[in-house]
Amino acid sequence: MARYTGPVCKLSRREGVDLMLKSGNSGRKVLERRGSQPPGQHGASVRRRQLSDYGVQLREKQKVRRIYGVLERQFRRYYGIATRTTGQTGAVLLQILERRLDNVVFRLGYAVTRAQARQLVNHGHITVNGRKTDIPSALVEVGDVIGVRAESRKRDYFKDLEETKQLNRVSPPSWLSLDAGKMEGVVQTFPSREELDMSINEQLIVEFYSR
């Protein structure tokens, strides 16, 4: 399955929530303007149907998959890893998604969206423990240091981050620490469920794959 490259606001409207796929609060503004209107030319005249249990589970799975920008095959693989890991399967799944390098780059404020973070990783701007890493799906470990390549810091994008002290205004989650001056973040621990998005009902995803 190819990665979705269409209008990202359409995905948020389909799920009925802001998936944070655009910078700032533009995604939320679209939802406020369009309300619960589904995407498509007939969206204004179509009411959202009452979903079956399966439909509710599917929508929750799709919502989380789209938040993190993960394809179905990879998402299913993460679920398989979660089922074989000690702990509640749903919470472990979310923890795995949070540990993706592109998500950590986003959480540290190097990028304003996960899609942009994925590009920064793909283009070789990000280092893990001092070594260039260009795999967005790489999972970080406790103690890993996430930085920006010295060569990349000379580029306009990162020079602007430094000159405007934008990273000084970033408040990363408690499981990450950030040295804005060095452009380095450290994975202090793995995130607990309480630190993750409370609007996600991961049990619905477990039920979906358990059918």
Curated annotation (Swiss-Prot):
CDD domains listed in its UniProt record: S4 (cd00165)
Span of domain S4 RNA-binding: 99-162
The encoding gene: rpsD
Gene3D superfamilies for the chain: Ribosomal Protein S4 Delta 41, Chain A, domain 1, RNA-binding S4 domain
Any one GO molecular function term: rRNA binding
A Pfam family of this chain: S4
Record-annotated disulphide pairs: none
The protein's name: Small ribosomal subunit protein uS4
Keywords: Ribonucleoprotein, Ribosomal protein, RNA-binding, rRNA-binding
InterPro entries listed in its UniProt record: Ribosomal_uS4, Ribosomal_uS4_bac-type, Ribosomal_uS4_CS, Ribosomal_uS4_N, S4_RNA-bd, S4_RNA-bd_sf
Database matches in HAMAP family: Ribosomal_uS4_B
GO biological process, any: ribosomal small subunit biogenesis
Family membership noted in the UniProt record: Belongs to the universal ribosomal protein uS4 family.
Organism, scientific name: Herpetosiphon aurantiacus (strain ATCC 23779 / DSM 785 / 114-95)
Job of this protein: One of the primary rRNA binding proteins, it binds directly to 16S rRNA where it nucleates assembly of the body of the 30S subunit.
Description of how the protein assembles with itself and partners: Part of the 30S ribosomal subunit. Contacts protein S5. The interaction surface between S4 and S5 is involved in control of translational fidelity.
Disordered, as annotated region: 27-48
NCBIfam families registered for this protein in UniProt: PRK05327.1 (NF003717), rpsD_bact (TIGR01017)
A cellular-component GO term for this protein: small ribosomal subunit
